[in-house]
């Protein structure tokens, strides 16, 4: 009997000392258009994507106060933050431009593209209370044989700016959360980066 009680006590201690269950998150993206004929549609490659060093980790990072961040050890990205950003922006571009020919740099070895979209994320402020603010520098870089096709300037307020073979721009987007918790926060991040893709689309259409 004493042996049984000892075994039960040890089992309870082990259960109490076990690590919490890890939860995994991913950003949601718009469905990519399906078309029976994709030939002749613009082809885009999104990436590489760079993010601040403090964000480039498997754990979710959340702003807990003005100068303090919290790293959630047991709440992690199912893939990677950079991969999710590329996927969401890719899906946004595909939907808005009406082309299925959009892929991320990290997911494909294909170099047969018309334009490459480089994303340099300067900051992601994620707060459970106030939502998300993302600051992204981006570059639309034509393939070598498409240089003459893209000669627009990224500043929409400039009428006399010189023509350029590459467009560079910046998106500062804020998105409120729809509810409490990390699920709502990741959903807000998804919407914010989809809006970044929308701003890139607007410039490509000009």
Residue ranges and their predicted role:
Residues 17-83, 206:
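A structural "domain/chain start" motif
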Residues 18-40, 96-163:
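Surface-exposed short loop/turn segments
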Residues 68-78, 145-199:
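Short secondary-structure boundary motifs at beta->alpha junctions and helix caps
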Residues 47-49, 60-65, 139, 143, ...:
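Generic beta-structure capping elements
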Residues 1-17:
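Sec-dependent bacterial lipoprotein signal peptides
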């Amino acid at each position: 009997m004493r042996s049984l009680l000892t075994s039960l006590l040890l089992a309870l201690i082990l259960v109490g000392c076990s690590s919490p269950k890890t939860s995994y998150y991913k950003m949601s993206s718009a469905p990519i258009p399906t078309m029976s004929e994709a030939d002749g549609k613009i082809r885009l490659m999104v990436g590489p994507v760079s993010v601040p060093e403090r964000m480039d980790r498997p754990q979710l990072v959340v702003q807990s106060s003005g100068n303090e961040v919290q790293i959630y050890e047991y709440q992690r990205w199912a893939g990677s933050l950079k991969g999710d950003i590329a996927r969401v922006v890719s899906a946004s571009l595909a939907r808005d431009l009406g082309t299925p020919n959009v892929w991320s740099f990290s997911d494909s070895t294909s170099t047969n593209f018309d334009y490459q979209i480089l994303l340099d994320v300067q900051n992601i402020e994620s707060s459970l209370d106030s939502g998300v603010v993302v600051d992204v520098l981006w570059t639309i870089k034509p393939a070598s044989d498409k240089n003459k096709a893209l000669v627009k300037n990224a500043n929409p307020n400039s009428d006399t700016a010189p023509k350029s073979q590459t467009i560079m721009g910046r998106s500062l987007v804020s998105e409120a959360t729809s509810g409490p918790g990390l699920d709502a926060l990741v959903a807000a991040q998804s919407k914010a980066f989809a809006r970044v893709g929308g701003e890139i689309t607007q410039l490509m259409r000009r």
